[in-house]
Amino acid sequence: MIVIFLGPPGAGKGTQGKKIAKKINLPHIAIGDIFRTIIKTSTSEAELINNYVKQGELIPNEIVNQVIKNFLLSSEYKNGYILDGYPRNLEQAKFFESFIKEKIKIIYFDVSDELLIKRILGRYSCKNCGKIYNRYFLQPKTDNVCDVCGSSTFDYRKDDNEEVIKKRIEVYKTETYPLIDYYKNSGNFYIVNGSKSEQEIEIDIQKILKIN
C-alpha cells in the first residue's frame, strides 16, 4: 500500500503519518524531516536548502525529486509506505509516477489558515525522542518533562515565525492547488477535516484505508 498525505504546513500530516504507519506496519517518510536532517549537516547542499527554508520558499523540484527517489528505491520501502508532504506540485507528481507504478491513495488534510498559523507557532518537540507538543493545544502532562521519555530538553524550530508561516501557506496554495485538482480525478482522492481532534482525524483515515 502506498498512501500520500497532502496538506499545508501544520495540517497534522506528520502526527497522523506516524500513527497510521505504526498501525499498518509501514514506514512513514516525511519530506520535511528528511530535509531538516540534511540542514543539520555542514555541506553545501545543506546551506543551499537552508536558504530556501529561511525565506519560506519551496525547495526546487529537482532537489526534492532526487532526494525522494533515492529514499524510495531502497528495498525497505518495497512493500509500501506513507509519504508525507510529497508530491507538492504537478511536476513532482509526474516525476513520482515515472518510477512508481503501484496504485496509490491520496488523503488531503483541509485546515483553515488561522488554525494552521496557531498550530505551527505553538509547536515544539522533545529533542531526545521527537514527541511533538504545542503550547496552545498539547503541553506535556508535567511542565518541561516529555511524556514519552522523561527528557527536559525541547527543540523549537527556528523557521517558525508568523511572517514566514504566512508566506509558506501562500506558496503552498499556489504550488499545490493544481495538484489537488489533478488528483481529484484519480478515483483515489479523499479529504479529511484537519480541524478535528487528533483522535477524530485518525478514525477518519482508518475508515478511508479500511483499517480495523
UniProtKB/Swiss-Prot annotation:
Keyword set includes Repressor: no
EC number(s) stated in the UniProt entry for this protein: 2.7.4.3
Region (NMP): 30-59
Compartments, as annotated in UniProt: Cytoplasm
InterPro entries for the chain: Adenyl_kin_sub, Adenylat/UMP-CMP_kin, Adenylat_kinase_CS, Adenylate_kinase_lid-dom, P-loop_NTPase
Record-listed ATP binding positions: 10-15, 123, 132-133, 196
Function noted in UniProt: Catalyzes the reversible transfer of the terminal phosphate group between ATP and AMP. Plays an important role in cellular energy homeostasis and in adenine nucleotide metabolism.
Alphabetical list of PANTHER family matching this protein: NUCLEOTIDE KINASE
Quaternary structure annotation from Swiss-Prot or TrEMBL: Monomer.
Name of the featured protein: Adenylate kinase
Organism: Rickettsia africae (strain ESF-5)
